[in-house]
A protein has these predicted regions:
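A broad "ordered helical/assembly scaffold" signature
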Residues: 5, 9-11, 22, 26, ...
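C-terminal helical cap and adjacent loop that interface with cofactors, partners, or active-site loops
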Residues: 47-146
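Short, flexible active-site loops
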Residues: 1-10, 37-42, 67-74
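Small-residue-rich helix-loop
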Residues: 12, 16-65
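Substrate/ligand-engaging "lid" and interaction regions
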Residues: 1-19, 139-145
Length: 146
């Protein structure tokens, strides 16, 4: 499996573009403005260059350096990216009242694959003790930290 090859096919990209749009919507709901560093910029062939440059993606695919055997139920794509990152995104979207159907659906699929309810076991506002914050409290936390 190579995340930069098989993981970036057009059909997969359409899903990640929707997921990224939900991430940007959550950022905006929290009061963050641009730049949002959309993932699509990494694959763009025109416009402003992003942090990897125009040939970055092509060079990653051609290198073969990212090819790896994965045990999906144990891999970081599930246990870090989904259980921790996506669970957090979904919980913040819920808190902020932002629709995140792609993130929510992927979280449910990841939970089923791993036979683990990532909404319960993942990193969420609830598990961090932050779900009870009101808008002013969240704004203060984001500006000042704990």
């Amino acid at each position: 499996w190579d995340i930069h090859n098989e993981g970036t096919q057009p059909s997969v990209r359409s899903v990640t573009n929707r997921l990224d749009a939900e991430r940007v919507a959550v950022r905006e709901a929290l009061g963050y403005g641009a730049p949002h560093f959309p993932l699509a910029d990494h694959y763009a062939t025109d416009g402003d260059e992003w942090m990897y440059g125009r040939k970055g993606h092509e060079q990653l695919v051609d290198s073969g350096d990212w090819r790896e055997h994965i045990v999906l139920t144990e891999h970081r794509y599930m246990r870090e990216d989904t259980q921790q990152g996506l669970a957090f995104l979904v919980s913040v979207a819920d808190w902020a009242g932002v629709a995140a159907p792609t993130a929510t659906g992927l979280l449910a699929i990841g939970s089923a694959i791993c036979d683990d309810d990532f909404r319960s076991s993942g990193r969420t506002l609830e598990r961090l003790g932050l779900a009870g914050l009101d808008r002013a409290g969240m704004t203060k936390l984001l500006a000042e930290g704990l």
